[in-house]
Amino acid sequence: MPRDNRLYSGFVNHDYILTFSIADEANRARLVALCAGPWQGDEVTPDTWEVSNTLSPDQMERAILELMGDADRAAYYYLSDSKRMFRVLLG
């Protein structure tokens, strides 16, 4: 089976730990608004959130990348179907 470079998870809701450093205040505010709103997140620190949503890991990554500049950094952690924790570094 050829690899398609997608991150799969069979869970209906996905739980993530997201930590980020985004310099642009508008983009940072948009990410915080996503975490607090539709992503159903709980603030751990101003730059770290626990979120639970229906986005797949690929969709989550694309949504975060859209808000990041060249010097920004983000990492998220998620649990896979096999109960393994994965860390994805962005930026």
Indicate where each model-derived feature is located:
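Short linear sequence motifs
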Residues: M1, S9, N13, G69-A71, ...
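Short amphipathic alpha-helical surface micro-motifs
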Residues: M1-R3, R30-L34, S56-Q59
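Low-complexity, compositionally biased segments
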Residues: L7, L18, N27-R30, E50, ...
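Short glycine-/aliphatic-rich beta-strand segments at the starts of folded cytosolic domains
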Residues: R6-I22
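Short, intrinsically disordered low-complexity segments
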Residues: P38-S82, F86-R87
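Charged, amphipathic alpha-helical regulatory modules used
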Residues: F11, A23-V44, S80-G91
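Short loop or secondary-structure boundary microenvironments that flank
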Residues: S21-D24, N53
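Short, solvent-exposed beta-alpha or beta-beta edge segments that form flexible loop/patches at the rim
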Residues: P2-L7, V88-L90
